[in-house]
């Protein structure tokens, strides 16, 4: 019953929102990786296909231009992948520590609140036990049973 009123219920909202945002970002990054890798593979295949030697000189110059264009696109896709890796590293280094520290601080605050609640509960139980013991002693010392035993 105490857990429902504690920090665990309130912490699930931001945590769920952060998880949803992280999932969305992960999907976007995976889509970006798929697009870039597909581009690299397609452009490489086109370069290999165009690299066949043909007889007419006009066709060879067109194929050379096509190879240049495909090589340029391949380099752009590879550069995009390198930027993505760099971005992932920066995110892991900077955002990871910040969010981890925030989460740790939040959990420390929640545990401090739970410790305070537990201490108050234990103090109340001690007071109740003390009052009950005094009441039992009072009944014992004033009872007829005690008088007959002494």
From Swiss-Prot:
Family: Belongs to the Mediator complex subunit 22 family.
UniProt subunit comment: Component of the Mediator complex.
Location of the protein in the cell: Nucleus
Pfam family, one: Med22
Keywords tagged on the record: Coiled coil, Nucleus, Transcription, Transcription regulation
Domain of life of the source: Eukaryota
GO molecular-function terms, A-Z: transcription coregulator activity
Residue ranges the record marks as coiled coil: 99-127
UniProt protein name: Mediator of RNA polymerase II transcription subunit 22a
InterPro entries: Med22 (IPR009332)
Function: Component of the Mediator complex, a coactivator involved in the regulated transcription of nearly all RNA polymerase II-dependent genes. Mediator functions as a bridge to convey information from gene-specific regulatory proteins to the basal RNA polymerase II transcription machinery. The Mediator complex, having a compact conformation in its free form, is recruited to promoters by direct interactions with regulatory proteins and serves for the assembly of a functional preinitiation complex with RNA polymerase II and the general transcription factors.
